[in-house]
Every structure is written in C-alpha cells, then in structure tokens.
UniProtKB/Swiss-Prot annotation:
Activity modulation: Allosterically activated by GTP. Inhibited by UTP.
Keywords, alphabetical: Allosteric enzyme, ATP-binding, Cytoplasm, Kinase, Nucleotide-binding, Pyrimidine biosynthesis, Transferase
GO biological process: 'de novo' CTP biosynthetic process; UDP biosynthetic process
Physiological role: Catalyzes the reversible phosphorylation of UMP to UDP.
Pfam family, one: AA_kinase
Intracellular or extracellular location(s): Cytoplasm
Self-association and partners: Homohexamer.
Superkingdom field: Bacteria
Organism: Streptomyces coelicolor (strain ATCC BAA-471 / A3(2) / M145)
Name listed for the protein in its UniProt record: Uridylate kinase
Single GO MF annotation: ATP binding
Amino acid sequence: MSSTKAEKSDDGKVSGRFMLKLSGEAFSGGGGLGVDPDVVHAIAREIAAVVRDGAQIAIVIGGGNFFRGAELQVRGMDRARSDYMGMLGTVMNCLALQDFLEKEGVDCRVQTAITMGQVAEPYIPLRAVRHLEKGRVVIFGAGMGMPYFSTDTTAAQRALEIDAEALLMGKNGVDGVYDSDPKTNPDAVKFDALGYGEVITRDLKVADATAVTLCRDNSLPIVVFELLKEGNIARAVKGEKIGTLVGDQGSRD
C-alpha cells in the first residue's frame, strides 16, 4: 500500500479502493451544530462523480457537528457515555450523506458498529467489500462501537480491513498539515509530505496517534486535504498533488 494514485484505464475510468474520512464539522457548513443540506449535497455530488469514474469509495464521517466526547468530558460528562453520544451523531451524518448520494443515482449502504437494524446494516467487513465490488458506496457509522476510539482511528482500521489503497482525510477549513495552527499563526508552514514518525513525534494534528500508528505499522498512506474545495475529492482519488501526503518516505517521489 505505497501509492495513493488510482489506476486509469484507456477509456479514462479510474480504479482503486479508497477510504474517505470526512470531517463532521464540515457537514454543518459554518462550523455550528447540525447538518447543512447544501454542503452535504455538494460533497455527495463529488463522491458520486468519482464512483461513476470507477473508484471504489468507503467513508467514515466524524460527529463533531453534533458531539465530541472528549470535549463533553471536560465539561463534566462521563467520557464513555459522551463517546457513545458522539457515535450516534456520526450515524445521523451517515444517513444524510446516504440520502444525497442516492439522489445522485449512486447505490449506498450504511454499516454501523452499534446495531440499529431499522436504519443500517451491521458492520460486516466481507459484506462491505462485496458492496464496493458492485459499485456501491459504503459508509461506516457509529465509530468503532467502543468509547475512547476516535473516528480517525475507525477510518484507519476500516481502511485496513477492506484493503483500501489509501486513507484520504478531508478536513474542514485547512488544506493540509502545518507546523502550527494556520488559523492562529499566519506564518505557519505547510508540509508537502511527512513521514509517519515525524507526525507522531512532533504531535502534528493530522489524526490521533493511534490512527497514525495503525497506518504506519501497515504502510497505509494518508492524504490530508481540504474537503470543501470543489474538485478536491476527485484530485485526492486520482493521486494529484494536493494537501499533505503522510507515508513511509516522507516525500512524494
């Protein structure tokens, strides 16, 4: 799993299987609470376009537009219970994206780590792979189904289990990995590429250390890019040089 580039056939179609990790905060549009249908529809259109081009797309969505377990813990809530609230929030995002993907004519299945049979399938890895092989999008909801695990870690684990080529992390309002927060430091420097070890030792805010370590131990490349810039999902899938690549070598060569 060393390349992030989808293969392209003579007819211009792309192939390859990718895990797309979407920021839950982006679903609210302006960083507030809830779901902005216009934003979700725009994301769905971009995903539908790459699926029609032949890519196999699995998705994990955060729940930051509803709840963040770690933040609720700081405010006095039990961490495990607040994490479960966050997991349920991700399912609402999954259903919203599923609806708009199907409006775009793309078959879509939601699989959840917490069983909720009336709205989604249970998480069954082999079934997820069969869906992908049939051209369906699979959205994984409810995180890992256990507290203390982030949706970034979920995305890394699911990507490995379905044998994805790369983990594509669509961020809200930031176009890659920087040496400091570009929202507060105008002199922040963006990285073109990084090694896994450097991300961990410098505590760069790509994903939590568990997720990055999983990717490092299994040589799963990560591409961090701005989610809401038009065309970026397709660029990431096609292997164009956008955002920041995190991999074994720390370069794009």
